[in-house]
Amino acid sequence: MSKQKVVVGMSGGVDSSVTAWLLKEQGYDVVGLFMKNWEDDDDSEYCSTRQDWIDVVSVADLIGIDVEAVNFAAEYKDRVFAEFLREYSAGRTPNPDVLCNAEIKFKAFLDHAMSLGAQTIATGHYARVRENNGRFELLKALDHTKDQSYFLHRLNQAQLSKTLFPLGEIPKTRVREIAEQIALPNAKKKDSTGICFIGERPFRDFLNRYLPTKPGPMKTTEGKVVGEHIGLAFYTFGQRKGIGLGGSKDGSGEPWFVAGKDIPSNTLYVAQGHDHPWLLSHTLSAGNTSWVAGEPPADGFACGAKTRYRQADAPCTFSSAGAGEGLFELNFDVAQWAVTPGQSAVLYDGDVCLGGGIIEHAVTGQPATRQPQKAALLTAR
């Protein structure tokens, strides 16, 4: 009987390398595929593509598998990066890794793998897939400290049915041990962090290459002008560093945080203190939804939710009634800090990831007289 063919997305990192080795050991016919998703900085000090490809080839030679490279840069720019810029231009803070998984790694890559005759694909993500009564569920990794289901919540039944996540069953420490034991050439390579196409470069410098500055007033939540911002796109809700008010003696003396943006007037609002009312939200609304099972939870469903990666699940209640077409609301038991439009609100039932949506608006503790201004900003597209 022929072996089942699986195409593994290999990045040159330890996780995807160990994934390929584990599947080879389990008897799969493994083929490695290196995805090149960005071309603008091939000669930049921040671009590691060449070294990553060298590492992929070295690992493939060691474990005895074929490997090829495929260029998805055009698809990435059209499906992911263009949306990234649109969202920042609208004053929101997107998460391109979520969109990259749904559109590139589990769509363009999956389609390419199927064209090679593969039955399944695999990646080095820390998550799990389980079949339950004919439906496929996306679960958190057993190692919750490394769980990446938040970034995978937009995957659908067709994608999950053809996906393997071997690392979801083992802790990260064991992955590193395996890499050392089998003498992977990249065993000591550091994990990648941050947005893939930005790398280690200063984020504001990168964004300024594509979006112009647009200075405007920086005001306190009481309306007092305390400075000038360089453009709303260059700030995110809850931001503390890089505001330019570190030495300000105004107010309470506590640190300043970005507390809001008003798009029509090009105003950036700042507040003092981590727990300022403008930074706390009991309720959010989200749109552009995607549900793993193909349908949303029932109204009134009690679940947990993350509004950012590495956040503990926050108890809340789900509702779609009255939220607007294609929208849902979450009402949290405890106020959440810096719920940011453009980020993903992802729902969980224990370890099962249900899906989620893109945050449109969060109701904060600011005075009611200012709520319309805040709402206009947060729902601006």
UniProtKB/Swiss-Prot annotation:
Q: Could you tell me the Gene Ontology terms of the biological process aspect for this record?
A: tRNA wobble position uridine thiolation
* Binding sites annotated in the UniProt record for ATP: 9-16, 35, 124
Catalytic residues in the record: 100 (nucleophile), 196 (cysteine persulfide intermediate)
SUPFAM superfamilies named in the record: Adenine nucleotide alpha hydrolases-like
Pfam families membership? tRNA_Me_trans, tRNA_Me_trans_C, tRNA_Me_trans_M
- Segments carrying the region annotation (Interaction with target base in tRNA) are 95-97
Do the record's keywords include RNA-binding? Answer: yes
Its annotated compartments are:
Cytoplasm
Q: Which reaction does it catalyse?
A: S-sulfanyl-L-cysteinyl-[protein] + uridine(34) in tRNA + AH2 + ATP = 2-thiouridine(34) in tRNA + L-cysteinyl-[protein] + A + AMP + diphosphate + H(+)
Highest taxon of the lineage: Bacteria
Q: What is its EC number?
A: 2.8.1.13
Q: Which GO terms describe its molecular function?
A: ATP binding; tRNA binding; tRNA-uridine 2-sulfurtransferase activity
Concerning NCBIfam families, the annotation shows: PRK00143.1, trmU
Q: What does this protein do?
A: Catalyzes the 2-thiolation of uridine at the wobble position (U34) of tRNA, leading to the formation of s(2)U34.
Q: What protein name does the entry list?
A: tRNA-specific 2-thiouridylase MnmA
State the organism named in the record. Paraburkholderia xenovorans (strain LB400)
